[in-house]
Amino acid sequence: MAKAIPKISSRRNGRIGSRKGARRIPKGVIHVQASFNNTIVTVTDVRGRVVSWSSAGTSGFKGTRRGTPFAAQTAAANAIRTVVDQGMQRAEVMIKGPGLGRDAALRAIRRSGILLTFVRDVTPMPHNGCRPPKKRRV
């Protein structure tokens, strides 16, 4: 009769969830990318390593509702909730894009209790580069 192979648990040593410990991040950079169709909020440390991110799509909004200010506010709140738990107190904000979610995301960041050192608009502006797409006719 064959020997029974002992079952090896994937949760050895009682560890559940991620293997890395939660880092303490006192200062970070919050990147808000607001397009007309979606808003993406990424929180990084000062070296540029991503700590947390969220978007209007991952927050549960689909279709044209992703471009709304309320969706951007929800995405910003979701991204910041995890880093506040990791001890972030101060942050810089970089806002990129022409979308409706710019101001709503910034309001949600201000309301979270993180002290903002500065807010910078880093929207790429062409110095007469590529030809823009033709205007829509609806």
From Swiss-Prot:
One GO term (biological process): translation
GO cellular component annotations of the record: chloroplast; ribonucleoprotein complex; ribosome
Signal peptide bounds: none
Pfam families to which the protein is assigned, alphabetical: Ribosomal_S11
Subcellular location: Plastid, Chloroplast
Basic residues compositional bias, start-end: 9-22
Superkingdom of origin: Eukaryota
GO molecular function, one term: rRNA binding
Keyword DNA-binding: no
Similarity annotation: Belongs to the universal ribosomal protein uS11 family.
Keywords noted in UniProt: Chloroplast, Plastid, Ribonucleoprotein, Ribosomal protein, RNA-binding, rRNA-binding
Protein name listed in UniProt: Small ribosomal subunit protein uS11c
Source species: Nicotiana tabacum (Common tobacco)
Region (Disordered): 1-22
PROSITE patterns, per database record: RIBOSOMAL_S11
Quaternary context: Part of the 30S ribosomal subunit.
Keyword Transcription regulation: no
InterPro entries cross-referenced by the UniProt entry: Ribosomal_uS11 (IPR001971), Ribosomal_uS11_bac-type (IPR019981), Ribosomal_uS11_CS (IPR018102), Ribosomal_uS11_sf (IPR036967)
